[in-house]
Amino acid sequence: MMGLFPYSSGYRIQSDRKVAICSVHPSEQATLQCLGCVKAKIPVAKSYHCSPKCFSDAWQHHRVLHERAASAVNENGNEEEEIFGRFNSTGSGVNTSLTSLQSSGSLTNGTTPLYPVAVTQRNGGETWFEVGRSKTYTPSADDIGHVLKFECAVIDVETKLPVGHASTVLTSRVIPAPSPTPRRLISVSGVDIPVHLDLDSCLSSSGTFTVLSYNILSDAYATNELYSYCPSWALSWTYRRQNLLREIVGYRADIVCLQEVQSDHFEEFFAPELDKHGYQALFKRKTAEVYSGNINTVDGCATFFRRDRFAHVKKYEVEFNKAAQSLTEALVPSAQKKTALSRLVKDNIALIVVLEAKFNNQGVDNPGKRQLVCVANTHVNVHQELKDVKLWQVHTLLKGLEKIAASAEIPMLVCGDFNSVPGSAPHALLAMAKVDPMHPDLAVDPLSILRPATKLMHQLPLVSAYSSFARMPAVRGLEKQRRRMDPSTNEPLFTNCTRDFIGTRDYIFYSADSLTVESLLELLDEESLRKDTALPSPEWSSDHIALLAEFRCKPRTRR
């Protein structure tokens, strides 16, 4: 409208009583504070915890912050963000760094008030501080524990006075971003990798490399109906994407395999953001659109690799829809083709990438020969009643990988969300290279695509990386991880944890004749996750957990 313009401003309310929020569980009020963080001048919001157990569980993270602050006194206040999520060393003793917060007292660090004192506005007995004059505002550390007010008014150009009443919106109290308990990288021999180690130089000199597999939960599936136990703000994509990125970058994996990555999120967020951290990106979208018909909501598999560690050689895209059409044309009678296609066409895909290592390793038989690695990243159909479709998709992928393996001596990595629990036919095919003809899953085969059962086999010597935990002797340092494994299957007790389901659906398989597992990312325990009912939560932004394995290429035997 001519002669008028909008004017926006933001304010923070100053209360007499300060409210501290737990840095790990932001829905909880803090009752304890880490004095070590206060003395180290780490941002005070990161020092609060809701219970002694909460603090104890996060103690390794605090130790790292204290050590880094002590060795780099000139570091800025974002130090803890830089090492968020990295692997931490073991330690004990937390009581000396803990103090209780009295609910009636003012929270300070001993010398300086927690919040600023410049008054800019007083309304109705409340004191407000102006924090911005733009259409958008990102809360800062100073805002934690406070209510914010956003005000928008229409101003007359000539008089510079408001026209009518300003529109005002009040927020809930600002809470700090949660700090998930750091996960350690544990050697399968039981020796943890120290956090102060320079992981980059370690990997380059030793010839090992790390692979991460993670279903990040597509925004299209992250609905309030499915995950009503997760606060809406923690379920929003604007929040989850930053939390996921921080977690993924913190693992510093050489190869990253993500599932349920939406097309628009890949192009507009993950690819450019991970590029800043030295990753090259490849993506394969599923072959159909989800819910709205908007092509941007279609999810797929994304594979990233560090440019300083690997070079891209070749990419293969597996569309199970096309394979289903070929199978139907070749084997299914004409009268059943429509029914067969309806059952088999489920839009799942796999992305296969061949990479060349840039680091020295002992896997090559002469210094001038390059080391190749083949990485498959897939997301198998989710419907539990389609057992035949799941098995057929996994079998189709493995037969394709067999052809690649036959063309060159190349280590294989098969990562992803297989939507198949340990002991299922797809898992048996992956882990045992065959399926027992009497397996109960084979009873579901209305199209007879799994017969004879003897054809359900492959020649790849695949082993589940996390089964290394179960195979190791009960040495000190591994007991906790062994308790998080299922001894009957040699797989984790769970990689997917929701209110209605808990179990393992994600795996990293490797070719045992050419690779050996050096270390594994520790597993999470169900008790800690159930504090927030299940996943996703403010702490962990997917309903799956990330898996990571460190590998070394075995020396090749000359033929």
Q: Language-model segments: which ranges?
A:
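Active-site beta-strand/loop signature of hydrolases that rely on acidic residues for catalysis
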Residues: 211-217, 240-270, 352-353, 374-378, ...
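Structured beta-strand-rich core segments of catalytic domains in phosphoester-bond hydrolases
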Residues: 180-208, 255-381, 386, 456-459, ...
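Ser/Thr/Pro/Gly-rich low-complexity disordered regions
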Residues: 1-48, 52-207
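Hydrophobic beta-strand positions in extracellular immunoglobulin-like domains
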Residues: 152-154, 355, 551
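Metal-dependent phosphoester-hydrolase catalytic domains
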Residues: 309, 345, 359-365, 385-388, ...
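Eukaryotic serine/proline-rich intrinsically disordered regulatory segments
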Residues: 65-119, 179-184, 291, 319-340, ...
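Acidic/histidine-rich helix-loop elements
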Residues: 217-238, 326-330, 343, 384
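Amphipathic alpha-helical interaction motifs in eukaryotic regulatory proteins
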Residues: 23, 35-38, 50-51, 55, ...
